[in-house]
Amino acid sequence: MKEYKNLQCDVLVLGGGIGGLTAATEIKEVNPDVDVLVLEKNFAGYAGKANRGGGVLQYFDLNRVDPELFVGFHTHEIGGLFTDQPLMKKYVSMSGEMLEKLDGWGVVMPRAEDGGYRIIPTGPFTAMICIDLDITLKVRRRAEKLGVRFMDKTVFSDLLTEGNTVTGAVAFSVLDGEYSVIAAKKVILATGSQNYRVGSMWSNGRGDGYIAAFRAGAELRNTEFGNFAQLVRIRSHNEVVFGENYMYNAKGEHITKNFCQHRETDISSKAIREWYIQNTTGNGPVHLDFGDEPQVNLELLWDRPYGKKFRVLNDETGATVDTDLEVCPMLIGEQSPMKVDREYRATLDGLYAIGDCSYCGSGLAGAVPAPPGRNRGSGILNAVFAGLVAARNAAACDYSGEFKPLCAKQIENAIARVEAPLAKENGIKPEAVIEVIQHAMAPVEQSVVMHADRIAKAMELVQKAKTMLPDMKAEDYHEAMECLEAEAIVTSAELHYLASDMRKESRGWFLREDYPNMDNNEWFKWIDAKYVDGKIELCTEELPTDDWFITKEELITGLVPVTEEEKQTELYKKYYLREMTKPNPMKFMHVGEPKDGTKAQHPYDLNKLFDEGYMDMEIGFAQLPDGGATLANITEMPGVTPEMFDFWFAWHGLEDLRYKVWDREDHYFARTRNRDKALDKSLSMKERYWDTIHDVDENCGLGKEHIQINFRNPADIGFDPEKLKDFKGTIVCSGNEHSPCIMCHFLRPVEGGCELRTRFWFGYSIIGGKPVKVLPDGVEFPLIPVQALLAHNIKEFANLAAILPSIYEEYHADFE
């Protein structure tokens, strides 16, 4: 057996990207007496993905964003109901602390004139901050000052264990082949995800770290959720972030409409499937058409000198070959399956796994691959978050005891495994094995848009690659490292397809064409993997939902919860259990894209609603010319009278169930703060809800959120009192000087009932009895929540139109 150096440290950090550097630095800040060693196959500070990507950090304004509301949004819109709610809440809650930590470590983040961060809104809850690509160098410098030790150009091949406890690792130098056996009391795995070496930006994600842990006995979880793909320009392979919103086929048809009802947070597997369908049905190629919409150039917003040369060179090179905007999907991968708890402890004692090693394995984000994971800017912050959490747990441990003895047989086997391809006189290059796996994984119809037949085809290639592994030959220790990576890439692909074949449903990003629906009865569970006697074994695990604030029952049924007391009522039996009336599906065509804002009604023109006929935009949503936003919906309400409508808004805020039966999938409660007024029979029905406030919990399309609705007399928000005197309908409206939203439900009689014309205006308040724009000049109100609210409004009022006449008949007499 080859000779080796014996080394010791309290904490061994495997991987010198942003996650590993964060963990090492934080441990030394919390407990300076802990001896920390970082081992990196490249150079720590230049390794990982944080210094070669877009350089963006996710940002949450915690003065505006309730972490639980974001968790609800993420659970439904991104995570396929599998989001670990308490862990995600912790991530969001720590966002400000993480930014301050990076700032304190010397990472330069752009500031606005007022001293706050310069941000770009990216969704209803999130924004992003751009940073320069020297982030990892800055953190390494801080770690060095604190006394963290580094071993660069050193590959770890195997973990050492005693029973179920990690005791250290075996490593070798890629420069001269010198072996090191490192005893450690704690080990933090921060070696990244598996990216199958398809896309150059992510090619350093080789999966060898977590596969080594897997072979040592660590369990994995959610290996099927590691198949992210991104649209790229077909010649340069440059990413086109958010390009899925602008997809057109060869016939000039806007095919985004085929899979997306409203603009989503990021690309989904449905976009990949649409590309595949268009090309297999003769409608390809697919190209992008941005129309007149300006494209954001982050380099124009912030000067990032360190990464600027790279970005300019990359863009200039791409421009020489990208003669048009034809796109195709490119597999990114991002398998990140180390099974960990909420302190990022793996199933082997003494082992932590952070960042892209354990993103899916932690359950944090649910059924979605590692960052970008349909959540732009979360990659770096996820690594920082996991690094901080694991580091604080590790720093609090007792390091006073002796090191555990290392197993000589394990050391011998580890060195022999590295040396085996070096000893061969003849053989194949590891690239030959990797290429076979790329043929199995890179075609998105096999790895992303999955079907049993295509999974079987891909598995044949995986098995072929598996048989090639013993024939690999290495000329030097660089190639010996590559042989380890080839073994890992084969195992990663096998894990992906075994678990994908096992999961008979579609969920979140995960898509099975032969099982297109989410199956919460059979598959509300994780798939775990164990390595037993040299073979992969899969089993299922129930999700631990006891401390989730959105309950499992609520997630599975898709209905808001009801109490046992509510279940005894006639209102529950007759209206909650009743299937909701579905709106005309043609109405949802108006939810896909914004309308022309110059033709939409402005809040300053409230009184035009009294005019006969219809306006240019009676249904749809739009950006108004001054930056505000609006939505309009029109609902036919046969058999409904203005008296019924007024009754409903005075009556439903008195009991939670009354709001639930309006929309049992999205309405949790509406509670009036003015019960005495609502019950005062000396007042007219309108007066019983005018100048009252309802506290509302509701899912308006982006997850559960809390809303305050201040109902007003229409004359107090700008409607003409003279016109109101002659109006035969009713107007239910809200708005005040505190809220940047004005709501108006304008109900007018028509033959056979009434017609409801709804308007919402965003970026405006009621000040001095009239609408006033409060949105800063030059700022546009984001359209994603407006778009989502339109879809919700269409849904809820279709059902109210169906149930209101009978509810009024049964309940109004006792209320009046």
Regions found by a protein language model. Give the residues of each.
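Conserved N-terminal glycine-rich FAD pyrophosphate-binding loop of Rossmann-like flavoproteins
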Residues: 42-68, 200, 227-231, 238, ...
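Mobile, glycine/GP-rich and aromatic-enriched active-site lid/loop segments adjacent to catalytic centers
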Residues: 96, 103-157, 224-374, 442-561
